[in-house]
């Protein structure tokens, strides 16, 4: 039901309008500028045919293939750890002899921790480098998933460490979403995000199956937790090799330079008028 609202009321990004320059692009850009309190521009920067022809499939081009593989792998691996907590906590707690309602209560604390983790992570990104913060968060996610697997059969202790595991694992998801948004250039960002998340969701399917298989083989919970926590560790290692992309100066900075030049010309013209 929100699709019509988005279609009619959410404007296209300035980057996209500058790159593609469809009919009425200048008017739409100036309308956005006015809403943000900026001066209008008189003309759009020149865009080469090669730039206009760039497609969403560029995420598989030689320039972006490494980025696509790294981000997709990191997300897939961390999702494996994240969904172990999300799907297996109630079963694990119930198998310890607690009532189903108590098992559900422990999972609630995982979600509470996750909500807090996402909020705190968002605040910290204002002060700490995004990639470094995400890597550290993934490592702590693995630590607390491992600790949860070794907690005694005590609801309070399990709830505490489950909340901490939820805190860091969900914060890691938030960090990966932010990295995905920065990893791809504007024209391929939507498709790149969809591809990475779609690929990574395979981890949400595989994670419960793998954990169940390990438990069925007779592996004890502490060992299973260690194995499932490895996903976050590997995700953190993979992220170390990522070089975040930035948009070409031909998009954002060129139109900003156009705007500044337009403002300067207006100021000069006003100065001449005053002198006369």
Language model features: what each stretch is:
Residues 1-49, 237-263:
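Central mid-sequence intracellular linker of multi-pass
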Residues 60-118:
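Extracytoplasmic gate region of multi-pass secondary transporters
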Residues 93-94, 124-125, 211-219:
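Interfacial helix-cap and linker-helix signal at transmembrane-aqueous boundaries
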Residues 100-101, 186-196:
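Loop-to-transmembrane helix entry/capping segments in MFS-fold secondary transporters
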Residues 118-129:
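Helix-to-loop junctions at the C-terminal end of transmembrane segments
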Residues 132-146:
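Structural signature of the two symmetry-related core transmembrane helices
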Residues 171-184:
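Intracellular juxtamembrane helix-capping segments at the cytosolic ends
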Residues 215-230:
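A membrane-interface helix-boundary motif in multi-pass transporters
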